[in-house]
Structure formats: structure tokens, C-alpha cells
Swiss-Prot record:
Annotated PANTHER family: SERINE--TRNA LIGASE, SERYL-TRNA SYNTHETASE
Matching Gene3D superfamilies: Bira Bifunctional Protein, Domain 2 (3.30.930.10), Serine-tRNA synthetase, tRNA binding domain (1.10.287.40)
Assembly with partners or alone: Homodimer. The tRNA molecule binds across the dimer.
Similarity comment text for this entry: Belongs to the class-II aminoacyl-tRNA synthetase family. Type-1 seryl-tRNA synthetase subfamily.
Species of the source: Chlorobaculum parvum (strain DSM 263 / NCIMB 8327) (Chlorobium vibrioforme subsp. thiosulfatophilum)
A Pfam short name: Seryl_tRNA_N
Signal peptide start and end residues: none
Name by which UniProt lists this protein: Serine--tRNA ligase
GO molecular function terms noted in the UniProt entry: ATP binding; serine-tRNA ligase activity
Length: 427
């Protein structure tokens, strides 16, 4: 959430940000917000004036009664009217503040100055790579669907029977390979990269979604259980960030870094017409998430560190990849800056997104009220929050199966995963 003081002082800058994000239609929200803010200021002043009048006259009434100069009934009657006015103003103020908050919640984050200008994903910029690793694929490669079916690793048909399209079933060595990936990533991030592992709930309340920015902007993308007021998480970022919602963090404990595995659930509303075969677009997938809470001046250094931690996984697995910087028209509403890591699919002959690494600056912390006191004293400030997929397994599995296949239809297990799987080859 943006600081309303910043919006008051820089309304045109906010509108320019909306233009860069291809959200110029939301510019009237800025004017409406400032109008409501001015109304609130006037209403607060009127309320304060009436309360001051009531306090002053209450003292006069007490003095009249104490000195025996009368009953003060006329003044008491007037103050009852004043109290009724104050009650009406308080009610109106509460409604107005709710409207202001809802407007603030719908505005996207500021963009970092280094975010490139662009209208869509076609204008994203290569940041690093391509990073290549040698794989002997001098034969007609099979795609992950054919490999998964022929080797008994994946069963999309039975997943569709059980739940619906986009809910895969891992079977046999496919299930063990998936679990090996998750455990390898968690172990690497906790042992080598300094993250504390957490295992969060897969269901959250609306306050948690609001805190990380998925609500109300992306309400149509989450699965909702209305009877319980709960939502299936789209990413572990939501519960892990909300671990510290409403808390004052200790300055000397920053940065705080968590790594968490979770299943992720996304409705993928609006994906009609996109390639939804196999793992290319699913409603449920597994992911290891990295979440960081930092001092503001350290957050862009932390962004590069998180990116390097995600890259380290791909380097260990020897999966070819590249890193792109998302342009202003493609970056998520919550992020101030974002990198995407894309893995190469030889069968699809294209890159597939496997990770996003984002700096939200104080956007989530302001929504979630996560603060710290610099030096342990003084005025509290909002921390900066960051997150990165480290990594999502679905498209990673696509690239892994396709790169590690052999001419005779087997899959060689990456060396770093063999201690986890207990086997070297899938046949």
C-alpha cells in the first residue's frame, strides 16, 4: 500500500506510475482518493472543534452547578445536540476512512527507477544469460508429457478424474523425484544460504491475502472456502510474510530470512487460449519460497542475493536458464522491481518461467503493519519485504525431464538429487 502522504505530495508522479504500468484508467482513483482525503481532514477538524466545544461547555456547566448559579439545563440540552453531531461525524468518518483504505488497497506499488519502460512481456529485458550446461540431445527429444507417461512418472488423466484439469498426480519414481527436488532446495537454502525453514499453513484468511497484496487485486485467482472465510494459498509468500503481520521487529535481528515449501493453488482465471498442456499451466503445483524482511537501505542488495540463491539451484541441477527484468507493463502490481528466471524446454523450444524474484519495498509491510525501530529506538519505520521462488517444481520438472532424457527413453537423475532419490536412472 502506498503512503497517503506520498500521494498527497506527488499525485502526478503516482499517475505517471499508473501510465507506465498500463493502468492509466485508474488515474481518476488518485483524484477521488485526494478528494476523500480532503473531506476526511475537514471532518476531523469539525469533530475536533465540536469536542473542544463540548469539553469547554462541560466545564462551564460544572462551574455553574458548583457555584449555585443555576442548573445549566439549557447548556446541557445544547451539548446533547453537539454530542449527537459528534456521533454522526464519527460514523461518517469511519465510513470515509474505509473508502480511503479501499482506494489505497487498489493502487499498485511505486516502480524502482531501474525498471525498464514497456507495455507487455514482449518488452522485458534480458538481465543475465542464457546460462548453458552441456546435455547430449543429438536425437529427437520427447516432451515431458510423453516421458512422464512412458516411464510411469505422471498421471494427468487420473488427476483430472479426481479433481479436474490442471491437478497432476505424481506416481512411482516421479513422486520420489518431485520430493527429492523439494528437499534438495530446502536443504540448500537452509544450509548454504542462511534461511530458516518454516512449514506454513496452506490456508489463510482474508487479512493475510490483503497484507501481501493478493486481495482485492487478485481475488479472482484464489480458491475460496466462504463457509470458513479461508482461502487456498497461491504461494507460500502469503503465510510466511504474514508471520510478522502487526509486529515490531528487532533491528538487530534484521534481515530475517525464511524458506518454505508449500503446495500452491491458482484458479488461472483468464488463461483460456494459453498452452495448458501438462505442467505448462496447472492449478496446483509445488514450490519452495524464499522470503526476506530487511532494512530499507539493504533491500536491493537483498534482491540480488535472493536471485543468486535461486540461480544456485539451477546451476547445481545443470538446468539451462536465463534471467529477465520485467518491464513496467508486465511487472506485478505489488512489486517495485522483479526478475523472472526462465528455464529452457528443448521440446517446447522456448523458455518457461520457473521463478519470480521481487522487491516490494514497504508496500506489503505498510499493508501488514510490519515495522522496526532503527537502532532499537526512535520513530518506527516499515521494513522492506522481498520474495523469490526457489523454485517452482512444475516447469522445473519439464526442463529436467527433457534435458536428462537419453536416446533410449530413460531419464538420468541429476547427481545432486541422487542422495535424495536413492536411484541414478529412471527406466
Amino acid at each position: 500500500m502506498l503512503d497517503i502522504s506520498y500521494i498527497r505530495q506527488n499525485p502526478e508522479e503516482v499517475k505517471e506510475m499508473l501510465r507506465r504500468r498500463q493502468q492509466s484508467d485508474d488515474a481518476p482513483k488518485v483524484d477521488r482518493l485526494l478528494e476523500r482525503d480532503a473531506e476526511r481532514k475537514a471532518m476531523v477538524q469539525r469533530t475536533d472543534d465540536l469536542k473542544a466545544l463540548r469539553n469547554r461547555v462541560s466545564k462551564e456547566i460544572a462551574n455553574i452547578k458548583r457555584t449555585g448559579q443555576g442548573s445549566g439545563e439549557e447548556l446541557i440540552s445544547q451539548m446533547k445536540e453537539v454530542s449527537d453531531q459528534i456521533a454522526d461525524l464519527d460514523l461518517g468518518l469511519s465510513t470515509l476512512e474505509g473508502e480511503i483504505e479501499e482506494l489505497l488497497l487498489t493502487l499498485p506499488n511505486k516502480l524502482h527507477e531501474s525498471v525498464p519502460e514497456g507495455r507487455s512481456a514482449d518488452e522485458n529485458i534480458l538481465y543475465k544469460g542464457p546460462v548453458s550446461f552441456e546435455h547430449n540431445l543429438d536425437f529427437p527429444v520427447k516432451d515431458h508429457l510423453e516421458l512422464g507417461k512412458s516411464l510411469g512418472l505422471l498421471d494427468f488423466e487420473r488427476g483430472a478424474k479426481i479433481t479436474g484439469a490442471g491437478f497432476p498426480v505424481y506416481t512411482g519414481k516421479g513422486a520420489r523425484l518431485e520430493r527429492a527436488l523439494i528437499n534438495f532446495m530446502l536443504d540448500t537454502h537452509s544450509a548454504n544460504h542462511g534461511y530458516t525453514e518454516v512449514f506454513p499453513p496452506f490456508m489463510v484468511n482474508k487479512e493475510s491475502l490483503r497484507g501481501t497484496g493478493q486481495w482485492p487485486k487478485f481475488a479472482d485467482q484464489v480458491y475460496h472456502m466462504p463457509e470458513d472465510g479461508l482461502y487456498a494459498i497461491p504461494t507460500a509468500e502469503v503465510p510466511v510474510t504474514n508471520l510478522h503481520r502487526g509486529e515490531m521487529l528487532e533491528d538487530d535481528k534484521l534481515p530475517i530470512a525464511y524458506a518454505a515449501y508449500s503446495a500452491c493453488f491458482r484458479r488461472e482465471a483468464g488463461s483460456y487460449g494459453k498452452d495448458t498442456r501438462g505442467f505448462l499451466r496447472v492449478h496446483q503445483f509445488n514450490k519452495v519460497e524464499m522470503v526476506r524482511f530487511t532494512r530499507p537501505e539493504k533491500s536491493y542488495e537483498a534482491l540480488e542475493e535472493i536471485l543468486s540463491h535461486a540461480e544456485a539451484i539451477l546451476c547445481a541441477l545443470k538446468i539451462p536458464y536465463r534471467v529477465i527484468t520485467l518491464c513496467s507493463g508486465d511487472i506485478s502490481a505489488n512489486a517495485a522491481k522483479c526478475y523472472d528466471i526462465e528455464v529452457w524446454s528443448p521440446a517446447e523450444n522456448k523458455y518457461l518461467e520457473a521463478s519470480s524474484v521481487s522487491n516490494f519495498e514497504d508496500y506489503q509491510a505498510r499493508r501488514s503493519n510490519i515495522r522496526f525501530k532503527p537502532g532499537g529506538k526512535g520513530k518506527p519505520e516499515f521494513v522492506h519485504t522481498l520474495n523469490g521462488s526457489g523454485l517452482a517444481t512444475s516447469r522445473l520438472m519439464v526442463s529436467l525431464l527433457e534435458h536428462y532424457q537419453t536416446a533410449d527413453g530413460k531419464i538420468m537423475v541429476p547427481e545432486v538429487l541422487r542422495p535424495y532419490t536413492g536411484f541414478d536412472v529412471i527406466e
